[in-house]
Amino acid sequence: MSESPMFAANGMPKVNQGAEEDVRILGYDPLASPALLQVQIPATPTSLETAKRGRREAIDIITGKDDRVLVIVGPCSIHDLEAAQEYALRLKKLSDELKGDLSIIMRAYLEKPRTTVGWKGLINDPDVNNTFNINKGLQSARQLFVNLTNIGLPIGSEMLDTISPQYLADLVSFGAIGARTTESQLHRELASGLSFPVGFKNGTDGTLNVAVDACQAAAHSHHFMGVTKHGVAAITTTKGNEHCFVILRGGKKGTNYDAKSVAEAKAQLPAGSNGLMIDYSHGNSNKDFRNQPKVNDVVCEQIANGENAITGVMIESNINEGNQGIPAEGKAGLKYGVSITDACIGWETTEDVLRKLAAAVRQRREVNKK
């Protein structure tokens, strides 16, 4: 007589049948493994070389080996694949024009942390209709990343969990940890194992110490629970990431992109730290996208005067300016090339901002020659 199955029909071990477990879980759906998705949507040789080049350039800039400025620019979040690819083609052309002064990486954010609730990004809800088809979201995200990098444009993204990078990180050149998660041990551990530079934003209250601490923590080896490329739970051991840096994004205490704030930030950084990046949006724009060019003017003045600590900037930009709510009819009712999360500057303004920034870099070279 054969033994009875160890697991009940609902998948729970029989020894736990009396336990109150998963009482708030409504259900589980199968999730494709990272390995399967990477086989189904393989990276092209051009895509992989683009990702590697973007990483090398970013590392050289934040460590002071390259005197250009690293620029992370693009939509607050991507919801429209066609618009994202049109934006990328425009940005690639501008990147080629300004490559002597700027190393441009497209901001390609697919997951959004929310203060309370709201649309959480292309991976979580690709159809923007609360169907949460995450498998479709991962497929769309990977195909988009292959397409963007295949035109020779490096991309950067926000890191929100320890699972999604397994699907996409081979195509990424830059990672960001947001203000809400900089203090999280999980995200510091994640950053310690990523194969590209990672920027930690200062806290939402404007304090810098959490980002400085995060960089130091991520530089060390860590051990934590994760998943393998085949989707198997595993203990992950990381090497440590020495290419982490602080992003100044402002906060409740005010902005922190001016010369005084930059000097104070420099004073807080331990010896040997990587350079600073300034986020033109969020607290530094007082959440008004029209202030981003004003932030750029102040940053350009500092760079033109010889400030070498500013090694990067982050800009929220789209084809068309502003943002929009999600209408009742969903994606069909959305305006083309307009953000559905944070408001962004439009393309024409983006060109002006980046050309001014490139000119400031050229002026810094002249100042530093003296």
UniProtKB/Swiss-Prot annotation:
Top-level lineage group: Eukaryota
Record pathway: Metabolic intermediate biosynthesis; chorismate biosynthesis; chorismate from D-erythrose 4-phosphate and phosphoenolpyruvate: step 1/7
Keyword Transmembrane helix on entry: no
One Pfam assignment: DAHP_synth_1
Catalysed reactions, as listed in the record: D-erythrose 4-phosphate + phosphoenolpyruvate + H2O = 7-phospho-2-dehydro-3-deoxy-D-arabino-heptonate + phosphate
InterPro entries (alphabetical): Aldolase_TIM, DAHP1/KDSA, DAHP_synth_1
Keywords: Acetylation, Amino-acid biosynthesis, Aromatic amino acid biosynthesis, Stress response, Transferase
GO cellular component term of the entry, any: nucleus
Molecular function terms, GO-annotated: 3-deoxy-7-phosphoheptulonate synthase activity
Induction: By amino acid starvation.
Keyword DNA-binding attributed: no
Activity regulation behaviour: Inhibited by tyrosine.
UniProt GO BP: amino acid biosynthetic process; aromatic amino acid family biosynthetic process; chorismate biosynthetic process
N-acetylserine PTM positions: S2
EC number: 2.5.1.54
Purpose of the protein: Stereospecific condensation of phosphoenolpyruvate (PEP) and D-erythrose-4-phosphate (E4P) giving rise to 3-deoxy-D-arabino-heptulosonate-7-phosphate (DAHP).
Family: Belongs to the class-I DAHP synthase family.
Other facts noted in the record for this chain: Present with 26300 molecules/cell in log phase SD medium.
Name recorded for this polypeptide: Phospho-2-dehydro-3-deoxyheptonate aldolase, tyrosine-inhibited
Species for this entry: Saccharomyces cerevisiae (strain ATCC 204508 / S288c)
Lineage: Eukaryota, Fungi, Dikarya, Ascomycota, Saccharomycotina
Gene expressing this chain: ARO4
